[in-house]
Amino acid sequence: DSIKSRTRRKRYLVEEMAPPGLEVIVGARNDSSWGPVVLLGLGGVAAEALGDVSLRLAPLGIDDALAMIDDLQSSALFDGFRGAPICDRAALAKIIVAVGNIVLSTPGIREIDLNPVRVYPQGVLALDALIIR
């Protein structure tokens, strides 16, 4: 095949559809004044529209990450609000801690965004991730 013919081919990425769950954003950035800062908020467009976020300086422990969840104005959504399933706070807390540790231990990373992360009754799943160096 010539290069020209190969560049005309369409490529697709097909992935299994993830089940519904509560969507959050987990992120961190190396701030020039504060150092590694970790963010948690509602995911998708809600992160930008509502501004309901919690911030902490890394490193974080599990208790710090759990407190970030409680700090959200929307924290009731994690507890089975209006009959929705109760979310796995412990699994989300582990992701929050891990993202903080990655930014803390990797000076070349300026920013990490996991958005959305779906939180389920058992476990979490990052559906999209961006790392900026």
Region roles according to the model:
Residues 1-133:
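ATP-dependent carboxylate/acyl-activation modules
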